[in-house]
Design a protein with these regions (language model features):
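Donor nucleotide-sugar binding/catalytic pocket of nucleotide-sugar-dependent glycosyltransferases
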Residues: 39, 53-56, 132-135, 139-188
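Conserved acidic donor-binding segment of nucleotide-sugar-dependent glycosyltransferases
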Residues: 320-332, 340-346
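N-terminal subdomain of nucleotide-sugar transferases
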Residues: 1-56, 369-372, 376
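A conserved mid-protein helix/loop that constitutes part of the nucleotide-sugar donor-binding site
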Residues: 19, 204-227, 237, 244-250
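Aromatic "clamp/platform" in nucleotide-sugar-dependent glycosyltransferases that forms part
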Residues: 288
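Nucleotide-activated donor-binding/catalytic signature segment of Leloir-type glycosyltransferases, i.e.
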Residues: 250-268
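Short alpha-helical donor nucleotide-sugar binding micro-motif in glycosyltransferases
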Residues: 80, 145-146, 267-268, 275-280
Length: 382
């Protein structure tokens, strides 16, 4: 099968969308399928693979990290026609997504789209209009786009329900992104990373991995750590990742009494992120806007007991009472759930063992097999 992937987000930007695309692409190629990616050009970045086609792009004030594609390049569109694609799979419902839709209809082939993001929760990034007005416009846009597709893929059932509430009537398939990152425990990496950051070998480390953005609810994480650090004097917090909210997070942390026990790594290459999981003892995830929360799956693979806010798609990746505890989105409950795992070490150890077992559910190969079933269903529908 020849598959065309269209996305605003792609290498070199590191986020859940890019990781999902690369994971799927790798597995499909292993199975003998041809996969071609179409994405915006990123200044200063050169692709190492011939199957990636770049469109001209511009940077915008609303999303400085994500160049906006200008999906008009006649020669490139002619090249798409010559590829004789069997299906188009869009990953974003914006410029590249609409281009993929137009090309699919022109070529008479099916189009599938994956919804990776709760876009309406990002309305605050567009300050020129009231947030509720922006949310309404975004929801209408999503409904129009997805109802023109032959199938929609989401990583968790809460997101499927959300799209149905928006009025999406296209068949929706739930397929979590597979975890291709080897986060299995590495004692040498654990020791080295702790030494690099001046953390004692016998300290306990609360870990967060992900973008530092306002919608990640990081104020809750920092306030919870501040409370817990007074009770547990061996507790440190690792914040692994970068993003537009990083400076503000650092400023908040600098005002904490235990600020010297908060470590910000900034952006970290994905291969090194795997090692940071080994340095942790517990994974704390405050985000309420995740469609899946792939980092939660990665944390399970590292054997980390998890505490997550019971919202969005993250809870579906966990088995509460086996590998994790779910908390309400308030400081008292979130702090209490983390404190329970810090205090009851036997419970934390049981969760750690089950976490590794449960992580096996998120197989990249299984993800690709299920996606191929969706492609087939889309072919019949189109």
């Amino acid at each position: 099968m020849k598959i065309g992937i269209f996305s605003e987000s792609y290498d070199p930007v590191l986020n859940g969308v890019t990781v999902s695309i690369l994971t799927l692409t790798k597995e499909l190629k292993k199975m003998g399928h041809e996969v071609y990616a179409f994405a915006p050009r990123y200044p200063g970045y050169t692709d190492t693979e011939n199957e990636v086609f770049r469109f001209p792009s511009v940077r915008t004030w609303a999303a400085r990290d994500y160049p906006l594609a200008i999906p008009y390049l006649p020669k490139l569109i002619q090249r798409v026609n010559r590829l004789e694609l069997d299906i188009i799979h869009t990953q974003t419902p914006f410029m590249m997504g609409w281009l993929g839709l137009r090309l699919a209809r022109r070529l008479g082939i099916p189009i599938i789209s994956t919804n990776h993001t709760q876009y309406a929760e990002y309305a605050h990034y567009f300050p020129l209009a009231p947030v509720e007005m922006t949310r309404t416009l975004i929801i209408g846009h999503l409904r129009r786009y997805y109802n023109r597709c032959d199938g929609v893929v989401v990583p968790s059932s809460p997101i499927a329900e959300l799209l149905r509430d928006y009025g999406v009537r296209t068949p929706i398939h739930v397929i979590p992104t597979g975890n291709a990152l080897d986060t299995s425990r590495d004692e040498e990496a654990r020791s080295r990373i702790r030494q690099e950051h001046g953390i004692p070998a016998d300290a306990r480390v609360m870990l967060y991995v992900g973008r530092l953005a306002r919608e990640k609810n990081l104020g809750l994480l920092l306030e919870a750590f501040d409370r817990l650090a007074h009770k547990h004097d061996d507790l440190y917090l690792f914040v692994v990742g970068g993003g537009p909210f990083e400076a503000e997070c650092r400023e908040i942390a600098s005002g904490l009494e235990c600020c010297k026990r908060v470590v910000f790594t900034g952006s970290v290459p994905r291969e090194k992120v795997a090692k940071y999981y080994s340095a942790g003892d517990l994974f704390a995830f405050p985000s309420v806007t995740e469609t899946q929360g792939l980092v939660v799956c990665e944390a399970l693979g590292a054997g980390l007991p998890c505490v997550a806010v019971n919202a969005g798609g993250s809870p579906e990746m966990l088995v509460e009472g086996e590998d994790s505890l779910l908390a309400e989105n308030d400081i008292e409950d979130f702090t209490a759930k983390i404190d329970l795992l810090l205090t009851d070490r036997e419970l934390a150890q049981r969760f750690s063992i089950k976490a590794v077992e449960n992580a096996a559910r998120f197989s990249p190969h299984g993800m690709a097999l299920r996606m191929l079933e969706v492609y087939t269903a889309g072919s019949h529908r189109s």
